[in-house]
């Protein structure tokens, strides 16, 4: 009997038991989180267990060290060295293989001229034409069954000018080399193409050029390896559809890592990045975008180096791609289901996939069936008189307390915006913790105050039912979003899981009421009529706050007395109207009617409320009363809390550093944090009002600490720096001043840092800082002149870019007024690989340029040229981007054709000044090498000393990246 009493005491719905269970739940969630984030570091292949994998990893790590020895953007000479090294490694690996072929775009002089939508800004209406000379390296492994649709594996070997490219995309490149080495030893069934492509960073151009190669016709599937962060685990960022997601599920058995929340966030443009996968997808390929995704404040900076990554990160990408490519290469694929996929992994142990369309159908079933079942059970319980009647005060306290928590949260978020809006960049845990604890603390205070004055007999059950109603409304809204987005909102699946589990908990409660004995309520009424002062030694003290169960001194009770007390639970309608009537939720009895009285029968066989009820019924009711809350808790709290916590962490982990990219991103992150914390709080709110004083005290303390950290701590540190964008601009049309542009977030961060630079501090250099769009600040000052070229004389920066007009018939009398105007330009640019021409007419709203021609040989006389590429556009061309490989070839030869104003608007007005058909051409040329030297008059000097100064003297809480495709931009302009 004592063992039974102890067991019942431990499992009874008491403050201590609930608080302990909450502690256990969140401890398990924390341990799972740590396990998930650290486990991959312990899974490196060992030489004695997996010698082949160990060799692949060690070789890949060595390749990575060589590739990332220096910065190697497309605009640098180091880029050619990386190309040559990769070509050498590819030839070593393929050797004399009978089924391997190698194609080098640089050797074959492959180039393309094509019209391109801005790949990084889909909303841009700027019409762009791009000329690109490729140095992609392609390898074909012909499969045993060449009839099978081929698989492309792709990664880019260029970096940005300010990063070594260890994760972006050195790890992807060396993982491709490892995959190539593996498949050379294990010939695939289907044909594999490897694309080591160049110039992804400034237009996804290497991937675009792939479709100019004949091998592109062999491939249907693609694995793209990318780095949009700077380490950690490689995530399945995007996948084409449910079929490809299931292929990942079937192939990646060890350490799978993916979440369709990333996919939805990326397609919704919450991340201002893009990968080659976009190009492959637009060209009809299906596959997998596997990428590093964090931290973004180190992405594209000097810290994207081998020092800040690890073999564990490399192995995670390498092994993931190897498992996936080996499966695809050797198996027939079921690709019938092409609807978008919802997918996620469970701590790297299991990968789950469901079609977003199927999820929508299940949502519809849940939305239709659950209220029908709930209402049906409610009507049955009303008919059987087992449903408690509750006042409107009882029904409104849970939603009102939740609403109050949201209002207080909004006020707190306003304080964050005013005092420390970029706090998420440093550590998103503190603001999320502050939001979460504030919501549950507010709910606790309001519900318990309400229960003190207006006790509720069944607060937990009412809250669970109301939570079901709230989640039903949310699921209806999210299902509408899912349908209207053509099932592209693949990150909404956590709400479906949460709704399902909370629905089961609510229906179990309603089912218990519906199956209750109708005589019990009658007996309860009779007992109140005949024993208004009923009391016994088996009754414990009622809690003033109206909590649900009693903490009973077990030694004072007999078995039947326990049963008798439990019988009264949840079956007597008693909602008191004031503090003088204290109601116990379990027993539903008004404490004012339960004064101790001699007339109360004390013996087991006496007439009492259990009269007419069988011992079996008492036992069943006792079991439900004491233990049903545990079932409800286990349904509503652990699984939804883990999934929602993980989902919020996934979102914040990917987006927290985007607050540095503008005010819109800041508000997006803040909104996600607020909504996420509310969703994290919902599972425990029906129970939290009953926690003990230790738990609520710790909650209040955690809120105070979190709020203080959120509002007061500086948002940037050495390990979490503010990323600032740099460029040095020389506008030859306005002189030779080398104006340094530093772009970063507003908030008095940039100017104090710049004022401490030696070249500014000890001179009269003026810094001009202005607010630009989207909460960004641009600071400009005249910096030290760059030394882009080695020379034996004084460097004249104006000689870097020269524009020669070879032909222009705008004012020719031989041209008809209705005839397009034609001009030819020769750009003379030294040691350069990239320039951009922008076309504009002062008298026409849209660009009048309709045709661009790029000549292969850039000679001074047009009769010696050969036309290589021509492109036309009826809608007009705003911009021409030029990318060439040969540094020694110092000219770009361009032909431009544009419409006179008469053709575009039909206006015959006089043009006495002859200016209405003028075409303004702005030229910008880019240099991206800074970590090297030029020799000027026999002395070695740094190429971009202004950037060196920032790197050397700025606090470590700043990191620097390029603003444009080069660090130095020389500009000029002409009118044709």
From Swiss-Prot:
Zn(2+) 2 binds at residues 168, 201, 300. Gene3D superfamilies: Zn peptidases. Residues 559-570 have a biased composition (Low complexity). The chain crosses the membrane at residues 16-36, 360-380, 393-412, 429-449, 462-482, 497-517, 628-648, 669-689, 693-713. Residues 582-601 have a biased composition (Basic and acidic residues). It is found in: Vacuole membrane. Zn(2+) 1 binds at residues 156, 168, 226. Residues 549-558 have a biased composition (Polar residues). Belongs to the peptidase M28 family. This is Vacuolar membrane protease. It comes from Saccharomyces cerevisiae (strain Lalvin EC1118 / Prise de mousse) (Baker's yeast). The lineage of its organism: Eukaryota, Fungi, Dikarya, Ascomycota, Saccharomycotina.
């Amino acid at each position: 009997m004592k063992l039974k009493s102890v067991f019942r005491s431990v499992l009874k719905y008491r403050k201590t038991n609930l608080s302990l269970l909450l502690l256990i739940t969140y401890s398990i969630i924390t341990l799972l989180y740590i396990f998930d984030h650290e486990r991959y570091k312990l899974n490196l292949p060992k030489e004695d267990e997996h010698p082949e994998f160990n060799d692949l990893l060690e070789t890949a790590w060595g390749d990575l060290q060589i590739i990332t020895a220096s910065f190697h953007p497309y605009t640098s000479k180091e880029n050619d060295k990386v190309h040559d090294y990769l070509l050498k490694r590819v030839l070593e690996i393929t050797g004399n293989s009978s089924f391997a072929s190698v194609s080098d775009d640089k050797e074959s002089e492959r180039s393309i001229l094509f019209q391109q939508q801005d790949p990084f800004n889909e909303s841009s209406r700027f019409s762009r034409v791009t000329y690109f000379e490729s140095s992609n390296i392609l390898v074909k492994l012909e499969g045993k069954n060449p009839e099978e649709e081929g698989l492309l594996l792709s990664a880019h070997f260029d970096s940005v000018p300010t990063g070594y490219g260890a994760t972006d995309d050195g790890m992807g490149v060396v993982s491709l080399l490892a995959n190539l080495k593996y498949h050379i030893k294990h010939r695939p069934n289907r044909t594999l193409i490897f694309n080591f492509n160049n110039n992804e960073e400034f237009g996804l151009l290497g991937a675009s050029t792939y479709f100019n190669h004949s091998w592109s016709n062999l491939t249907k599937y693609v694995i793209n390896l990318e780095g949009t962060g700077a380490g950690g685990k490689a995530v399945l960022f995007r996948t084409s559809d449910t079929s490809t997601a299931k292929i990942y599920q079937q192939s990646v058995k060890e350490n799978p890592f993916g979440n369709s929340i990333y996919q939805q966030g990326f397609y919704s443009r919450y991340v201002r990045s893009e990968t080659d996968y976009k190009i492959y997808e637009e060209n009809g390929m299906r596959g997998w975008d596997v990428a590093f995704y964090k931290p973004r404040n180190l992405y594209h900076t000097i810290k994207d180096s081998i020092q800040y990554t690890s073999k564990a990160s490399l192995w995670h990408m390498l092994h993931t791609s190897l498992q996936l490519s080996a499966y695809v290469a050797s198996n027939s694929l079921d690709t019938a289901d092409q609807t978008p996929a919802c997918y996620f992994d469970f701590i790297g142990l299991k990968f789950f996939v469901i079609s977003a369309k199927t999820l929508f159908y299940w949502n519809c079933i849940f939305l239709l069936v659950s209220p029908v079942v709930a209402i049906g059970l409610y009507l049955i319980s009303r008919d059987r008189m087992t449903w408690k009647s509750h006042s409107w005060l009882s029904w409104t306290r849970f939603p009102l307390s939740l609403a109050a928590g949201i209002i207080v949260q909004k006020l707190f978020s306003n304080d964050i915006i005013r005092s420390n809006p970029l706090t998420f960049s440093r550590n998103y845990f503190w603001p999320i913790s502050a939001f979460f604890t504030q919501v549950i603390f507010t709910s606790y205070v309001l519900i318990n105050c309400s229960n003190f004055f207006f006790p509720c007999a069944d607060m937990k059950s009412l809250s669970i039912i109301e939570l079901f109603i709230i989640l039903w409304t949310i699921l209806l809204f999210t299902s509408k979003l899912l349908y209207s987005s053509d099932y592209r909102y693949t990150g909404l699946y956590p709400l479906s899981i949460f709704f399902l589990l909370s629905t089961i908990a609510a229906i179990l409660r309603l089912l218990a009421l519906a199956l209750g004995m109708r005589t019990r309520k009658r007996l309860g009424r009779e007992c109140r009529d005949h024993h208004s002062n009923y009391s016994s030694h088996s009754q414990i003290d009622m809690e003033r706050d109206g909590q649900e169960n009693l903490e009973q001194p077990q030694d004072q009770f007999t078995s039947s007395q326990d049963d008798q007390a439990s019988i009264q639970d949840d079956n007597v309608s008693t909602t008191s109207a004031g503090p003088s009537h204290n109601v116990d939720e379990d027993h539903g009895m008004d404490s004012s009617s339960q004064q101790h009285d001699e007339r109360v029968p004390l013996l087991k066989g006496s007439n009492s409320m259990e009269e007419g009820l069988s011992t079996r019924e008492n036992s069943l009711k006792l079991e439900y009363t004491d233990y049903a809350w545990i079932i409800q808790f286990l349904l509503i709290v652990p699984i939804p809390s883990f999934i929602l916590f993980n989902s919020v962490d996934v979102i914040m982990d990917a987006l927290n550093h985007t607050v540095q990219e503008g005010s819109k991103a800041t508000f997006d992150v803040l909104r996600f944090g607020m909504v996420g914390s509310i969703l994290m709080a919902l599972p425990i709110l029906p129970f939290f009002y009953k926690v003990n004083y230790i738990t609520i005290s710790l909650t209040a303390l955690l809120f105070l600490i979190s709020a203080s950290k959120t509002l007061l701590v500086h948002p940037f540190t050495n390990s979490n720096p503010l990323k600032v964008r740099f460029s040095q601009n020389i506008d030859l049309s306005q002189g030779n001043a080398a104006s340094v542009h530093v772009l970063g977030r507003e908030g008095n961060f940039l100017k104090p840092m710049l004022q401490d630079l030696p070249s500014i501090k000890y001179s009269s250099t003026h810094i001009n800082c202005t607010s630009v769009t989207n909460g960004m600040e641009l600071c400009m000052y005249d910096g030290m002149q760059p030394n882009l070229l080695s020379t034996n004389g004084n460097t004249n920066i104006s000689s870097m870019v020269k524009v020669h007009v070879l032909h222009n018939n705008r004012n020719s009398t031989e041209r008809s007024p209705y005839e397009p105007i034609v001009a030819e330009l020769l750009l003379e640019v030294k040691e350069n690989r990239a320039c951009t021409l922008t076309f504009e007419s002062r008298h026409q709203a849209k660009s009048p340029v309709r045709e661009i021609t790029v000549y292969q040989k850039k000679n001074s006389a047009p009769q010696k040229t050969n036309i290589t590429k021509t492109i036309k556009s009826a809608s007009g061309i705003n911009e021409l981007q030029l990318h060439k490989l040969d540094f020694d070839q110092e000219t770009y030869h361009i032909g431009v054709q544009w419409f006179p104003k008469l053709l575009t608007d039909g206006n015959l007005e006089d043009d006495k000044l002859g200016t209405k058909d003028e075409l303004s051409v702005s030229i910008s040329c880019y240099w991206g090498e800074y970590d090297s030297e030029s020799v000027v008059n026999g002395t070695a000097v740094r190429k971009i000393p202004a950037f060196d100064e920032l790197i050397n003297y700025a606090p470590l809480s700043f990191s620097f990246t390029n603003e444009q495709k080069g660090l130095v931009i020389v500009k000029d302009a002409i009118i044709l």
